[in-house]
Amino acid sequence: KVIKAEHPAMSGVKEFEAWDETYKHRNHNEKDRTVLMVREVAGAGDNIKEPEPWTWVRTQGKGRVFYTASGHDERVWEQSGFHQLLKAGILWSVGDMRKKSYDKFIAGRAPLKYEKRGDIANYENRPEPLPYQFPLPARESMKYTQAPVGFRLELFASEPDIINPIGLAWDERGRLWVAETVDYPNEMTPDRVGNDKIKILEDTDGDGKCDKVTVFAEGLNIPTSLTFSRGGIIVAHVPDFLFLKDTDGDDKADVREVINTGWGTGDTHAGPSNLRYGFDNWIWGAVGYSSYSGTVGGEQKRFGSGVFRMKPDGSALEFMHQFNNNTWGLGFNSSGDVFGSTANNNPSFFCGIPATAYRNGKKGITAKMIATDRSFHPITPNIRQVDAFNNYTAGAGHALATSAAFPESYREKMAFIGGPTGHLLGMYEISPTGAGYKARNAFAFLASADEWFSPVAAEVGPDGHLWVADWYNFIIQHNPTPSKGRGGYDAQRGRGNAHVNPNRDRGHGRIYRVVWEGAPESKIKSLGGASDAQLVAALESDNLFWRHTAQRLLVDEGKKGAVPALKKKIDAGG
């Protein structure tokens, strides 16, 4: 019961009734205390004879203290009145100046707008399905998105320059290349010609924003990843891997070759992804349950749900690490250790002994789930999932903080896993244990109350900062297909094995940078046209991106002139 409704800490608070657990309070300190709510006597059998102080505020020197006995039982947290009580109490506690700043910020933020629709799945069996939230402009969406203290979120590009970004990579000049797929998930074409593109996004004036967009390749159909090799790019484009190259300097692909084929087409969210150049000069990647089945170098290969590597020309392909479900995450630390994530409740794997180490057809454990806690931590209750509720059900990526542009506590420790169904980019702290690693849940690196915020890729860029591809879409769920018995309405399954939903968006997309305010400026801006000596020097960069880029250029371009300097580095223990 509210007994001091006029107090600022009771602003907007209404009385509520809920089950809860608490201890009877004794020896109350009534000094400088104002009681705001009481628990009334429940009737016969209650161990109190008069209303019990339940919620109060106190002053402590220049500080303010807010207390409520509510909150032990989860049923209290379902009460909107309790939410308002906490909000009002916090805003009073932080002081008038902070409260005014908050009010000004909220007044300047576009409100979220909703509409009830009959084609939004309700696997959680809520009393009513969640309503449809209308999209926000990028700058307004950022106002609903939180980053850790000391980091700031910066917008690099948004629609119409980029739509539905699914993969990020940078060339030796530091330019961002993006795989864009408006055809995902169901518009698969028999001839594999579609509406998708590979774009080059550049910041030509150094203000941190994209101001030049070049379409490198178009007519693609659901490309899911790209990486650089042999002067061009390798693109995952099931059933093939394509090699695309510009030979005349106009930033347009005029070479298109199939270097590998056999990737499954049965499900567009279970194919190859996360391509990246490896320490061993092979191309590494992840693949889900759509699997691979084909012949490479005269050998029949068949594998799925794990990590593979491929020679850059496609002449060899090896399955390295077996995961236990649909895989869409891969990352390296600076020691060359391999990590990954899956879409279904396994946000962090460590890849130990590769499958290629087992001889004579023997099989052994090649990867282990190391996350000590699988839950994610959204900042909005409006979460729509199919199963494994409140856990990672769309885990994507596993990049690590491999540059000096992160705080010391992050470097080589923090891994970033997309959780688009929770509208967040999760974070795990990786630490050695025994012969492997463990991953401690470090909550969210980014989290948004905008239900469209959908981080599907996060990578450390040439500036050392973390770059994030925001798919920005209201519908993330791929399958199963909703039915009246499960999901609340009958839907159809599309060609990509995803349920058909008119709320899937094909008009938005964002690329963000998350910048640590204490980060040093990158010493390297570009390795385009770099000399042998410059490439060897770049192997000492404090950013793994530049070390790998220098290594790739030395190998791809056959820089034999660098051999003496490389031998000297090896002899010196470098």
Where are these regions (language model features)?
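Extracellular ligand-binding/catalytic regions of CAZymes and related secreted enzymes
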Residues: 43-52, 59-127
